Amino acid sequence: MSKEYIGTDCYNRKMELYHIGNEVYCNHIKNGVVVKTNSITVDNRVLGLFGSPHTSGAYIYDEIARMYGKKL
């Protein structure tokens, strides 16, 4: 499991995206401590994006928001 840095949120917290099975998680990190974790169950279309060499975590985050209507 590798965590991918995808940017900062509106509260200036680092965001990391990763998955375990069909569950995608997004950690929000402030001062080195995870302060919030959101998750969503996704299908294989999204999981396939994690293995793509030219696909960024930010793109995956946006695709999840578009497909499922939920921001992590």
Name each region found by the language model.
Residues 1, 27, 59-62:
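Intrinsically disordered, low-complexity serine/threonine-rich segments
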Residues 4-29:
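Amphipathic, interaction-prone secondary-structure segments
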Residues 1-4, 72:
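Short, Lys/Arg-enriched, disordered terminal segments
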Residues 34-72:
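Mixed-charge, Lys/Arg-enriched low-complexity segments
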